[in-house]
Amino acid sequence: MSSRIIRATAANSSIRAFVANTTNLVEKARGFHQTSPVASAALGRTLTATSMMGVMLKGEKQKITTKINGGGPLGVILVVGDSEGNVKGYVGNPQVESTNIRPGKLDVGAAVGSDGEITVIKDLGMKKPYVGTAPLVSGEIGEDFATYFLNSEQQPSAVSLGVLIDIDYRIKASGGFIIQVLPNVQEAVLAKLESRIGQLESITVMMEQGMNEVDILNHVLEGMDPKIVETYEVDFECDCNVARFEKGLISIGRQEIREMIEEDENTELVCHFCNKKYHFNKEQLQGLLDEM
């Protein structure tokens, strides 16, 4: 089953909602990076949130980048997404040791750390990208995105993200939701929503119970008449290619390329996002030098 996001409204369009099932997408990322359980959870949550934020973008070629740096042993989390919800990403230390808060509950906050910030960069096709930052609250990622929305975009939001890891370290389930109130929301609706959010079990419990994205939408916004507006098929997609790496080599300068030619028979470059390896022999490197 492919990963999917639904965009919906509720309460006479005074609430907007995004609900994601990203199980296959996050499993693909785990396969590329061979992440430990806690790294899978942290990366999976960030991929899920960024994918939902991607479909919030208006333009076809607009991009979003999310960077989380909490100073923890996991290192930096970096995720890039497009306006169709497709994402790619990596963590600084994919094999970081996993610890639990309690049995079955990974301590994502300890791995990520909370001494740092979340940065969101939106490339909207303008001269300069939009850059927003917010301090990390817990390193658990869901709370940190909610803080970002409130502090940087002045948008009150409920954010829930979760990744279930199987005993063989594969991704059993992954998903999340972002619920946002719009300026026309009535006080009674807001109070009802706040009460409902406060009563909810975690997103991982919902997924363990077998709920899909539509079930979760109806469960979270029960009694608020949710209506699905659009459905997106999303995936972990890396757009790396030989031409991009050739450009990267050219950008480091003639001297560096000469040193590579002198030192090695073959130069190996690895994509951070998908771990695909690219090899350049001396003749290819010399060809790049000749083009410069």
From Swiss-Prot:
GO terms for molecular function: protein folding chaperone; unfolded protein binding. It holds the Pfam family HSP33. Gene3D superfamilies: Hsp33 domain, HSP33 redox switch-like. GO terms for cellular component: cytoplasm. CDD domains: Hsp33. GO terms for biological process: protein refolding. Disulfide bonds join C238-C240, C271-C274. Keywords: Chaperone, Cytoplasm, Disulfide bond, Redox-active center, Zinc. It comes from the Bacteria. Under oxidizing conditions two disulfide bonds are formed involving the reactive cysteines. Under reducing conditions zinc is bound to the reactive cysteines and the protein is inactive. It is found in: Cytoplasm. NCBIfam families: PRK00114.1. Belongs to the HSP33 family. Redox regulated molecular chaperone. Protects both thermally unfolding and oxidatively damaged proteins from irreversible aggregation. Plays an important role in the bacterial defense system toward oxidative stress. This is 33 kDa chaperonin. It comes from Alkaliphilus metalliredigens (strain QYMF). The lineage of its organism: Bacteria, Bacillati, Bacillota, Clostridia, Peptostreptococcales.
